[in-house]
Amino acid sequence: MLLIAGLGNPGSHYQNNRHNIGFMAVDAIHEAFSFSPWSKKFQAEVSNGLINGEKILLIKPQTFMNLSGQAIGEALRFYKLDLDHLIVFYDELDLPPGTVRVKIGGRSNGHNGIKSIDSHCGNNYHHVRLGIGRPISKELVDQYVLGNFTQSDQKWLSTLLGVIANNVAMLIKGDSNCFMNKISLTMKSQGLQ
């Protein structure tokens, strides 16, 4: 079994925020495959399904971003899963919009959701960083990540979410380089990178 987490903040007020791109990625995966309806467990919304025969638990912590590790830690302990069975999708300021980078382990780079997971679980899991770009001024970071994606963002965003869902099986079988390459080629072929 693998646990695929998307980070974000709960509630309709935050639904379209840049900070919620992790939730959006997991929602796209949920829609692309025959997953169970969302239910509440582990201080999160969860859904079970199969991707290429692999059991998957999708999880969207409902604890707010800064406490995401509580929900993810509960789920890992309940299912007795090691960190190599955890994939986390989240927003990354230091990557251009529509860019994806996957790595195992590493630092939080100031991302409070990742800091929370690292403190509750450790950091040796699959980090899937989804580029949202960065505002011009450092003082505007909070306002930027908690701001909604703009109309001009919608084309690259919808394409990115679709290509993530269509190719997540590569990531699940451990081929993160092919996953990143497929996303990059798709985004570039459509002039979105």
Swiss-Prot record:
TRNA binds at Y14, F64, N66, N112. Belongs to the PTH family. One of its GO terms (molecular function) is peptidyl-tRNA hydrolase activity. It catalyses: an N-acyl-L-alpha-aminoacyl-tRNA + H2O = an N-acyl-L-amino acid + a tRNA + H(+). InterPro entries: Pept_tRNA_hydro, Pept_tRNA_hydro_CS, Pept_tRNA_hydro_sf. The record marks D91 as: Stabilizes the basic form of H active site to accept a proton. Keywords: Cytoplasm, Hydrolase, RNA-binding, tRNA-binding. Signal peptide: none annotated. Its EC number is 3.1.1.29. One of its GO terms (cellular component) is cytoplasm. The record marks N9 as: Discriminates between blocked and unblocked aminoacyl-tRNA. It is found in: Cytoplasm. The gene is pth. This is Peptidyl-tRNA hydrolase. The keyword Repeat does not apply. It holds the Pfam family Pept_tRNA_hydro. GO terms for biological process: protein quality control for misfolded or incompletely synthesized proteins; rescue of stalled ribosome. Hydrolyzes ribosome-free peptidyl-tRNAs (with 1 or more amino acids incorporated), which drop off the ribosome during protein synthesis, or as a result of ribosome stalling. PANTHER family: PEPTIDYL-TRNA HYDROLASE. NCBIfam families: pth. The keyword Hydrolase applies.
